[in-house]
C-alpha cells in the first residue's frame, strides 16, 4: 500500500509539473542588451553563411551591433566585428592590413568613418569584449549628451584605439 501511495504521489507531481504553463516558469528579461538591435536594422557588410558573425570571435553582430565596426582588407574583402577589441586583435595580432574602417553610430545605426566619429569611452553602458565600453557618435553634441547621462569621456578614434589596445593586452 505504501508503494502504491508513493507511486501515485510521484505520478500526480509529474502530471502537475507537466501541465504547468512553461512561460511562467522562466521569466524573460524585459530589458534587451543596450548594444542589440533587431537583425532587420543591422547593416551587415559581409557575404556568405556567417555574415551575421564577428570574423574574430564569432559573436552575433545584431546582438552587439551598437559597438560594431567594419573594415576592408587590401584585397577588398569586407570584414565586420562585434567590437573595437576584435578590430585591434585582427589588426595588431593577426596583422591584417585593414583600410576603410567604419563604426556604427549609436543613434542612427548607420556606418560612419571611425575618423569622423566621437567615441564615448568608459560609460555605464556595458562594453563588448571589454570592461571599458566604447560607443561612437556622428555628432559631438550627441556624444556629449550620452556622456553626460551615462558617464565616460569623449575621445577621437586614435585615442579610443589606444585604450582598446591597452585593454587587449591586460
Language-model segments: residues:
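Bacterial N-terminal signal peptides that target proteins for export
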Residues: 1-8
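C-terminal motif of bacterial Sec signal peptides marking the signal peptidase cleavage site
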Residues: 15-18
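Residues immediately within or flanking Cys/His clusters that coordinate Zn2+
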Residues: 51
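Cys/His-rich metal-chelating microdomains
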Residues: 60-61, 89
